Amino acid sequence: RKLSLVTGGATKEVETDETIQLKDLIGKFHKAYHYEKLGQTYLESRQFDRALEPFQEAIQRDPEMLEAKYGLAKSFHSLGRFEEAAEILEKLVKEDKKYDYGNAIFGLAECYRLSGKEEKALETYGEVINSFHFFKAYYHYARLLDKKGKKQEAIGYMKSIVGSSKDLPDYKLEKERFWIDEAYKFLRKNGIELA
């Protein structure tokens, strides 16, 4: 539950019962766990700026806390601070390459792409698609290959998205629909029609 006050056209965030309780626990116990939970609460309510400090405090108190590192990286990513997010994700992925079912290494590839580090992005997307079947990763990997002049290889990956989509259950098909449609568009643009 989040409360918002509108004053003079501006929205001001008001603390929720949960954030008040967590701040009270932090004041009493100063535990990394409570800082991390406060950061997660802010992250979930899309208050990314406010999430930074609790996550950083949690990491300072418990440098092994992967959840706090991941939350901090997600907050930086959401704020468009891709290089800072990548720096954290690089370390996290070294500790656990499969963290969050592959979403951490996928996020690292995204951060590289969004910060213009295309070579690193290409390499990291390659690692993602070797271990996980994220259509978005296949799509961006193919687009980067195309940018590098490797059109046939890119077409192959786009065909792979379309081909794999035929075996998906309905719930997964809906989740991946955007990337499947984008792959079709790419293929049509390159003169390839699929039945």
For the regions a protein language model found, what residue spans apply to each?
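Start-of-helix register in tetratricopeptide repeats
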Residues: 33, 67, 100-103, 136, ...
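TPR/TPR-like (Sel1-like) alpha-helical repeat modules
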Residues: 94, 129-135, 143-168
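Short coil turns that delineate tetratricopeptide repeat
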Residues: 29, 63, 97-99, 132-133, ...
